[in-house]
Amino acid sequence: MSGTTMVILSAFVAYLLLMIVIGVVYMKKTSSSEDYFLGGRGLNAWVAALSAQASDMSGWLLMGLPGAIYSLGTGQIWIAVGLFIGTVLNWVCISHRLRKYTIAANNSLTIPAFLENRFQDKKRILLLLSSIVIVIFFLVYTASALAAGGKLFNTVFGIDYHVALAIGAAVILCYTFMGGFMAVCVTDFVQGTLMLIGLLVVPLVAYLTLSGSLSDLLTQSGAPGGAAAFLNPFENGERPYTFIEIFSQLAWGLGYCGMPHILTRFMAVKSEKELKKSSVIAIVWDILSLTAACFIGIIGRAYLLPTVLGENGASSSESVFIEMINKLFSSHLGLPFIGGIFLCGILAAIMSTADSQLLVTASAASEDLYHQFIKKDADSKEILTVARLTVIVVSVLAFVIAWNPNSSIMGLVSNAWAGLGAAFGPTVVMSLFWRRTNLAGAVAGIVSGGLTVIVWDYIPLAAGQTLGSYTGLYSLAVGFAVSLVMIIIFSLATKAPSKEITDVFDKVAGK
């Protein structure tokens, strides 16, 4: 291992040790399941905002999105536009009412518990169904984060992908196991800050060191359709984007209102005043980070010449940010330790999502399944033990799913995002804003949304292709629409909610 690599490694080791120390500190402060899952509802504005956005964006922000733009051009920015719109609507429209409603609904600690309490589901159908959906789709989502970590260590240090996968999984498991929600949120705050600094600094410095015009360098790199097409958001190589392609990318924004690991941040903020501050901080962070990630894909295509990623044995396009940092700080500026810190920003993005996903899955398994169905008289410490064991089991299963080094980060994230967004998004929105929504409608929404995504993405029904591949339409858009329609139909076709349920709704709505 070269001297430069050793310096970068020292930055990684220092960073990983800091995360573990945070886990140890908060392990001592975590004595109950409410502490472990929601931090005692004590998050301040900055921690809530940055932890929500960091856990949202994941390695996809620093690897998947820049890689897609690097390969296909700025037409991929419509995903970023959709995500920004979704973020704004989630913070402005969903966060305040969800926080109030989860407190009014028997102080619900998780999204499945909230849905059960919201509709007074005595048969526990919603709790069981929601928990199963979370475990299934979060396994895939967590696997995407672990795969990103494996690719990071493999690219930077030349470590075998599978060994790298194990290292990343072990560290994330360690501090999530120990500290629970507060450890995850504090580490996510650190990680969200580091991500944003890296996103802003690296493309700017790389642009200033370009040895020619951006347009000329893009043409030399073999950009699809030439520089003009590459920089045109309405072009896909040598042809215009279709309406369906743009709509499908914008539809990513629909997923936000169905993401349990993001929604729990709203539930955990300590006051309405702090939540308002969080909204502003989160939206500003989102604008800056998404814009910078898009520029990484564009500038990276020119900056890395003569290397063209994805060709002639070079790294995949999803490694564009990693390769930029290595070239900029190790080769051009001779500052490998600083480069190592920025590479930790990528690791931060990966870890911030994986830890949140592990925690949500643990809460679904321990609080919503074990406590409610297996041992109802379990005390808080026993639930905490089950949660920690769940973190271990889920980590191992996600590790197995991520074992293939050719796994696409973008593909894994896309499928998991669609499944969770379609299953929970419409149900959460309607439960918060439509008084007539009832138990039958909520069940129909979750089942139809989740199944639509599975059928659309995995079952070849059209000339040997899946409907997603055949139509080019993102499964989240279809699943969200189907779920919304089913909620309305089943709610209107069955008995209206009781007065007790509507009284709580009216209280939360301020009527």
Spell out what each predicted region is.
Residues M1-K511:
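Membrane-embedded helix-loop-helix hairpins and adjacent transmembrane boundary segments
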